[in-house]
Curated annotation (Swiss-Prot):
The protein's annotated pathway: Cofactor biosynthesis; molybdopterin biosynthesis
Protein name per the record: Cyclic pyranopterin monophosphate synthase
Primary enzyme class: lyase
InterPro entries, A to Z: MoaC (IPR023045), MoaC_bact/euk (IPR047594), MoaC_sf (IPR036522), MoCo_biosynth_MoaA/MoaC (IPR050105), Mopterin_CF_biosynth-C_dom (IPR002820)
UniProt binding sites for substrate: L75, C76, H77, M113, E114
Organism: Paraburkholderia xenovorans (strain LB400)
Subunit structure: Homohexamer; trimer of dimers.
Its EC number(s): 4.6.1.17
Length: 158
């Protein structure tokens, strides 16, 4: 099993030194879903949610979340992101919404945490905008689907 990089020899948490790493293109894709009542799904699909355009606001929130990851996750490096692509898919059979985010940078460390944070913030925004009609919504299956770049190379979920 690989060693945990965020702990020093004494077991103390620290921010990993990435200064000696080469800058490479880094890409990560993450995805998650929010399940809801059919009536809530219909409000989103039909654009009738009282708070407005649920998907449009959630998309902006996801982008903002990716940019603020280092403020939320203590040992994450602040990164200059070069691209954040957010896709929402309405799924009537769930019923619910899937959120997929691709984050890119040219840097010394990966962007998995930024992609995961973006997905969570996007889905939390859907919850916030619809909680008045459906407090039982469930955010589920949030995970990294793939990552590219860096010393460890490419990885795709099985």
């Amino acid at each position: 099993m690989p060693e945990l990089t965020h702990f020093d020899a004494a077991g103390q948490a620290h921010m990993v030194d990435v200064g000696g790493k080469q800058e490479t293109k880094r890409i990560a894709v993450a995805r998650g879903s929010i399940r809801m009542l059919p009536e809530t799904f219909a409000l989103i699909r039909d654009g009738n949610a009282k708070k407005g355009d649920v998907i449009g606001i959630a998309r902006i929130a996801a982008i903002q979340g990716s940019k603020r990851t280092a403020d939320l996750i203590p040992l994450c490096h602040p990164l200059a992101l070069t691209r954040v692509k957010v896709d929402f898919e309405l799924d009537e059979t769930l019923p619910g919404v899937h959120c997929t985010v691709q984050v890119e940078t040219l840097g010394r460390t990966g962007v998995e945490m930024e992609a995961l944070t973006a997905v969570q913030v996007g889905l939390l925004t859907v919850y916030d905008m619809c909680k008045a009609v459906d407090r039982g919504m469930t955010i589920t299956d949030v995970k990294v689907l793939e990552k590219h770049g860096g010393k460890s190379g490419d990885w795709v979920a099985g």
